[in-house]
Amino acid sequence: MCVLLVLIVASSYMLAPKDNTAEGGIVNPNANGFFSEPKDSIDIAVVGNSDAYSGFSPLELWNEYGYTSYVSAEGHQTVAQSYSQLKKIMKCHSVKLIILETDGFFTRSKLVESTAKLINASMGSAFSVFQYHDRWKRVKPNELLKAPNYTAHCTAKGQWLSNEVKGYMGGEYMVKTDKREEIPFSTKTSLDMLVKMCAENDIKLLFLELPSQSSWSYKRHNAVKDYADEKGITFLDLNIDRESFGFDWKTDTRDGGNHLNSRGARKATLFIGKYLSENYPLSDHRGDNRFKQWNADYKEYLEKVKI
């Protein structure tokens, strides 16, 4: 058993990407750009699926409130995979708040597949050979014992910027009901692990649902609220009372109601930022010279966002 453990640890070090670029072998460089941020500089970690990286803007949050955040989200990211990403982030940063986008709670997969994802996510963060076991086909001999050197800088801090406008012209989808859509057992298992991890590390946890006409409903809202209430977690659902932050489905989505564009992300993030400023003791870093790169990144962000 000891020999096997040594082999796993050694293989994990040798096969793990030594840079957080696509060329370095990392999966999804945008989601892993936090490796390149100065140590302990990220206060808020945002995880979830494509709704999160489309609808949350770290640089809008920075400009308005001086909070530092990173969106480590991926398409179809499960809660188990969110847990894995958070374990990695916590090795680099002293996170004060975790924002978990809840759309991924309802990503369904076969029991065997979901169990495998949970095991891979929980073990992969500690033993990367489970995540990068196929990398031996591409890794170069001089990379095997090389120390990690993360160089990829994601200006948008994990956000997917989009100037596309394709509005949703349909009817109201948030029709109030007492019904609930069941959260899969595998998701609840992963959620319990994530909630426990936050409690053990004294990290605040916020459940967030960004506007999504095609994937959200009142039945899902009720199910998440039940779990959140049971665990004593705040749940912020931006699909309800959208008018309070000026959201407009005709102008604020890039694909007809599934994901937000950059205009929608700005509106949603400023609303979230106001809520955070009133409910969490987060630090405003705008006057700190150690964070001057954020000002440069914000200027570059403004050049890319046209809506």
Predicted regions and their residues:
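Conserved, well-ordered alpha-helix/loop/beta-strand core segments that scaffold catalytic motifs
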Residues: L97-R108, G158-F245
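Extracytoplasmic/secreted proteins, especially bacterial periplasmic and envelope-associated proteins
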Residues: F56, E60, Q81-S84, S122-Q131, ...
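Secreted/periplasmic serine-hydrolase-like ester/acetyl group-modifying domain
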Residues: E113-K204, H285-I307
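Accessory, usually C-terminal, subdomains that scaffold auxiliary metal cofactors
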Residues: I240-N258
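Membrane/wall-proximal cationic-aromatic binding patches
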Residues: C2-T68, T78-K88
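Membrane-embedded segments
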Residues: V47, D51-F130
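Second-shell loop/turn segments in exported
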Residues: V46, V71-G75, D178-P184, E209-S214, ...
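Histidine-centered active-site loop/cap adjacent to the catalytic His
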Residues: T253-R290
